[in-house]
Structure formats: C-alpha cells, structure tokens
C-alpha cells in the first residue's frame, strides 16, 4: 500500500492511494491521499481549519471508540489506540498534521478525511496496533 521514494534531494515521500489514484505524500506527515490533494487543489488563502474544529472531531472519534468498545464492536486494544491518538489531537500535540485551509468544497469532507487518515496512519506506526 505504501511505497517510499526520495523526491529531489530534500523530501522523502510515500505513495498513498485512493479512488482517484496515487499521490506522493511526505513521509513525516500523518495524512493520506485526500488531504494531499486538498492541499494541492484548494490552496486558497492563508487561514487553516481552526484547531477547535479539529479537536471537536477528535472528541467525537474518542467518544465513538469508547462506546464501540463498551458494546464489544471493536477490540479494547484498537479502542485504546484510537483514544490515545484522539487525546494527542485534543491536546494539540499533532496540529502540524492538519494542514487544510478553511476554503474547501463546502461539505467539510477534506477535513473529515484528514482526521480519518490521521487515525488510520498513526495506529499501526505509533501505537503498535
């Protein structure tokens, strides 16, 4: 799923894939293809999505993980990893991994996909899930 390559002499990237195809994403960033495309095609203005909104999404993801664990819909180790990742977002430790501008398509899909890709990419690498 992920291939790494060196671009130029400064940046290493990995290939991320989605329904549109593949795109290079910096290896040190916890976002996927959708976020990288949004950065490329919606580079409008200077204002980023506010941290308060990102933290709100993380609170919802954390609550969902707690409820799903309680209802035995996900394993405790997965729930614990989602909770840990969510807490890091809530505490602002990973703000640099949410690079999107406020000007998007109107539905907020890019911001939600950024949050989803963050969890997807950090769980196996940081939390050994």
Regions found by a protein language model. Give the residues of each.
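Conserved, well-structured ligand/cofactor-binding cores
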Residues: 4-121
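Single conserved hydrophobic/aromatic residue that forms the stacking wall/gate
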Residues: 120-129
């Amino acid at each position: 799923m992920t291939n790494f390559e060196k671009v130029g002499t400064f940046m290493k990237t990995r290939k991320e894939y989605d329904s549109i195809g593949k795109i290079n994403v910096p290896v040190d960033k916890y976002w996927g293809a959708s976020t990288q495309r949004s950065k490329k095609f919606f580079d409008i203005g200077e204002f980023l999505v506010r941290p308060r909104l990102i933290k709100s999404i993380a609170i919802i993801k954390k609550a969902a993980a707690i409820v799903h664990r309680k209802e035995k819909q996900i394993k405790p180790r997965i729930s614990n990893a989602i909770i840990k990742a969510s807490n890091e977002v809530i505490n602002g430790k990973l703000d640099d991994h949410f690079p999107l501008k406020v000007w998007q398509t109107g539905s907020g899909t890019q911001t939600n996909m950024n949050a989803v890709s963050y969890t997807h990419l950090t769980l196996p690498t940081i939390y050994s899930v």
